Amino acid sequence: MTPPPGGAWPSDPDERLARLVHDLRTPLTIVQGFAELLDRGATALDDARRSEYLGRIAAAGREMKEILDDEREDRLSQEL
C-alpha cells in the first residue's frame, strides 16, 4: 500500500481496509476504462493504440497485485 503521511499504518482493521480499498480503486478504474475502450472501439483502433491500452491494463494489474502482496506481507509480519 502507499505509505501514509508520517509512515505509520492504521492499526484499526477498518481503517486499513478503507486504505486498501482506496489504493485499489485507481488501478481498477484504469483496467475497467481501457477494457471498455477496447471493447467499444476494437475495430477502429490501430495496433499501436490497442497495444498502448493493453499495456496500461497490464501495468494496472501489476500495481494491484503489488498492493495486495504488500498488504499480505505486512499482515504476516504483524503475526510474527
Residue ranges of model-derived segments:
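Residue-level recognition of alpha-helical structural elements
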Residues: 13, 46-50
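DHp/HisKA dimerization-phosphotransfer hairpin of two-component histidine kinases
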Residues: 42, 48, 55-58
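Short alpha-helical N-box/ATP-lid segment at the N-terminus of the HATPase_c
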Residues: 65-76
